[in-house]
UniProtKB/Swiss-Prot annotation:
The UniProt record lists the keyword Transferase: yes
Binding site for phosphoenolpyruvate: K24, N25
Major localization listed first in the record, in broad terms: cytoplasm
Catalyzed reactions: phosphoenolpyruvate + UDP-N-acetyl-alpha-D-glucosamine = UDP-N-acetyl-3-O-(1-carboxyvinyl)-alpha-D-glucosamine + phosphate
Entry's localization field: Cytoplasm
Family: Belongs to the EPSP synthase family. MurA subfamily.
Keywords: Cell cycle, Cell division, Cell shape, Cell wall biogenesis/degradation, Cytoplasm, Peptidoglycan synthesis, Pyruvate, Transferase
Taxonomic source organism: Staphylococcus haemolyticus (strain JCSC1435)
Residues annotated as the enzyme's active site: C118 (proton donor)
InterPro entries: Enolpyruvate_Tfrase_dom (IPR001986), Enolpyruvate_Tfrase_sf (IPR036968), MurA_subfamily (IPR050068), RNA3'P_cycl/enolpyr_Trfase_a/b (IPR013792), UDP_GlcNAc_COvinyl_MurA (IPR005750)
EC number: 2.5.1.7
Protein name (database record): UDP-N-acetylglucosamine 1-carboxyvinyltransferase 1
Function (record text): Cell wall formation. Adds enolpyruvyl to UDP-N-acetylglucosamine.
Amino acid sequence: MTQEVIKIRGGQTLKGDVTISGAKNSAVAIIPATLLAQGQVKLDGLPQISDVETLVSLLEDLNIKAHLNGKTLEVDTSEIENAPLPNNKVESLRASYYMMGAMLGRFKKCVIGLPGGCPLGPRPIDQHIKGFKALGAEIDESNDTSMKIEAKELHGANIFLDMVSVGATINIMLAAVHATGQTVIENAAKEPEVVDVANFLNSLGADIKGAGTSTLKINGVDSLHGSEYQIIPDRIEAGTYMCIAAAVGEEITINNIVPKHVEALTVKLKELGVDIQVDGDAEKAIIKRKSSYKNVDIKTLVYPGFATDLQQPITPLLFMADGPSFVTETIYPARFRHVDELKNMGANIEADMETGTATIKPSSLNGAEVYASDLRAGACLIIAGLLAEGVTTIYNVRHIYRGYTDIVKHLKELGANIWTEEV
């Protein structure tokens, strides 16, 4: 059985423009949220990635008419039916858990396979379950491969999340939009994607206040109508291209960004010494690489701190620094599966998954055969391949396609010597 690989001959400097897609982490929540609407919904600005296709297929399993055309999705829920969702689709996609909250909100009942996605170590959904129970749901976890969630009635509740969780904040919000009374989520996630989902639900007629703060208030409504909605730009894709530009960009303009959403990365790149100009009015950044950078320390935090999803993509830049850099991963301490692959390329890097720390020293990279263990590790290896001398072959590229629209095509257009092969 053959598989597609990405090959990169490093050493090229890149130049040109790239336009950022809609936010993956918004899209994977908003697509399930469409099933709460009674009527037709049109979403614009979707990223063209495999996760979107999987979620559209899950909508179709509920007898929803869903037409995906490029960046636009049209959904008609008029003939929706509740049905168990198949494991083979659900287990491939972590964000399929948003179907739980949406189906609970719509039907007060769902049977769904246990979600999959990138292997980043423990990512329990206990906070989601806690929220569903507070709203009045009963959870049957007796089956090893699926979960049954059911409520006679959904009622508002005060819910304090034990840890800040984007997934739990959104999932509880989806389940609560039709609950009787008011639901208050304390210690809610503040990420732009949470705000985007709340704005979408409000466009359908929901009553949600406080999105973007640590306290979310949801006043239940009887029904939601259709709407047309534009998804925000993807701050992680934007950040990845900012790292690419800082690594190998003669001059790269990155269009369709929200400067506030990438502020933590922008500050860190400037600390490194990157030549970066951000134009908030035009929603773009212009970046020119330098031959060497200053060493820095990076600590991942919940928004508005440095995003865990950019910890891996920024790592290759640290090999260009003039001294050792230190990374502390506070969100997913096991998010260092890219380290051994970088070592195969000659990198001087050590990581400790128990403490969630890594030490990165100046290194020259050489092409090698490497394996993308997850989505952002794949982005890291692409940047490393662009920097390396010789040819780098990246396996498991399906992870990369889960989160980056046409990344090989975009890099070719910028001047990279990059291609795909079947092996």
